[in-house]
Amino acid sequence: MGVTGTPSYYSDKNCTIENFKRDFYPIIYLIIFVWGALGNGFSIYVFLQTYKKSTSVNVFMLNLAISDFLFISTLPFRADYNFRGSDWIFGDWACRIMSYSLYVNMYTSIYFLTVLSIVRFLATAHPFQMLHITSVRSAWILCGIIWVFIMASSGLLLKHGQEKKNNTTLCFELNLQKFKNLVILNYIALGVGFLLPFFILTICYLLIIRVLLKVEIPESGPRDAQRKALTTIVIAMIIFLLCFLPYHALRTIHLVTWDADSCMDELHKATVITLTLAAANSCFNPFLYYFAGENFKARLRAIFSKDHL
C-alpha cells in the first residue's frame, strides 16, 4: 500500500515532489534509524536480561521492540533509494520486503500498543478476575496471533516489487493499474488497523480515568499499578495521535482526491511527512518501556551498576 510513492510518469511533468523526497527522506530516515536502533536494541537487551522474571506487559513490550528493530533495519535501504533519486539497486524481492516491513511494523505496533493498554486496564480494574488473561503464557499466545494476523493480511504487498523505467528502477511507488484495489485496501486498513484500535484505546483511557476518580487507594502497590496503567495509555494515545493519525488521514485524503493530471505537490509533500512520522513511532516506544515497563528502570540500574564493577 505504498501510497506515498509517485507514479512513474511524474518525472515527465513539472512536479517538485521528487526533489522534495530526495532531500527530505534520507536525512529523516537516517535519524530515525540511529535513534530507533539504539533505543530498541538496548530495550531488547534489557528485557532479555531478566526474561525468567518476565510479566505479560514485558512480553508485549519485547515483541513491540522486536517489531521496531526489524523495521528500523530497513530504513538505510529506503534512504539510499531516495538519495539516488528514486533508483532501487537491491533487487526485486528486497523491494517487496521493504514495503511489506513498513506495514507489518505499523500495524503490529498499533495492535501491541492497544493490547498493552487493555492489559494494563484489566490488571488495574479487575486484578484477580483477569489473572488468566494477563499471564505470560496468554501474552505469548496473543502476540503470536497478532504477528500471524498482521503478516498474513499484509501479504498482498509481497506481490508488488520493483518497476523498470528508462534507466532507473522504481520501488515504493503507486501502481495506477491497481489503484481501485489500493483504495479498497486503504479503507480496510483504516478501519481494522487504525480506527478500531484507536476506539478501544480511547475507551481504555476513559475507563482508567473513571477508576482513578471513583476511589482513592492509599496503598502504594495499587496506586503504582494505576499510575503505570495511566502512563501506558497516555503514551500510547500520544503515539497514535502524533504518528498514526496524521498518516492514515493524509493517506486516505491522498487516495480519495487523486488526480492523474495534477502534481498535487503540497498534498503529496504532506503525505511524505506523515509517513516519516509513522516510521518515527519506533523512536517513541522506548519512552513507553522506560516510564511504564515492569521494573525497567530497576533493570537499567542493575545493568549499569554491573558495568561499573
Curated annotation (Swiss-Prot):
Extracellular face residues: 1-26, 78-98, 159-187, 251-271
Top-level taxon of the source organism: Eukaryota
Gene Ontology BP annotations: cellular response to hypoxia; negative regulation of glial cell proliferation; neuropeptide signaling pathway; positive regulation of angiogenesis; positive regulation of ERK1 and ERK2 cascade
Disulfide bonds: 95-171
Subcellular location: Cell membrane
Annotated TM spans: 27-47, 57-77, 99-119, 138-158, 188-208, 230-250, 272-292
PROSITE patterns in UniProt: G_PROTEIN_RECEP_F1_2 (PS50262)
GO cellular component: membrane; plasma membrane
Ranges of the Cytoplasmic topological domain: 48-56, 120-137, 209-229, 293-309
Family according to the record: Belongs to the G-protein coupled receptor 1 family.
UniProt protein name: Cysteinyl leukotriene receptor 2
Protein source organism: Rattus norvegicus (Rat)
